[in-house]
Amino acid sequence: MITRLIRQWDADIVIVNRPNDYHPDHRYTSILVQDSAYMVTVPFFCPDVPALKKNPVFLYASDRFKKPNPFQPDVAVSIDDVIEPTLDALLVMESQIQEGGANGYAGLFPEEPVGRQRRTEESRRSLARRYAGEATRYRDVLARFYGDERARNVHYAQAYELCEYGRQPSTDELKKLFPF
């Protein structure tokens, strides 16, 4: 199914978590997408949807896991201009971002409106700090694409690592795929 969807979308870029993510759903989805990274170009696999002539670029979203190997960014993108809509979109997913429930603790998301608003604001600040941390942590990668001066002024960023199974773009191609 994933192979079919990528073909139907005629994707240029596919972004997924790395296969050593903390969450089982993330790990297994990553493996399925990795498998599709090869299969999207194989004509006799899922013959009901035409195989892609050009393999998409498959990217891993950044994380802080160190084992079995740490995240190694190949591209970093400023999200300064879209940080607010990015946070708004993430906060809509209450069950994923705000409710908690991990490790058996279900008390993070209060039922009363004032408490819910407070939790939403805490989650917003936490997510913003994460993206600010990426801008700081991957400043050198930002500089490769934006130049030193512009990179110094980036407040929020997202970084990505190339998946070894998809197309391996050059720096010039990455600059075309991501408008710097």
Regions found by a protein language model. Name each.
Residues 1-46, 52-54, 60, 71:
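Active-site beta-strand->loop->alpha-helix modules in alpha/beta enzyme cores, enriched
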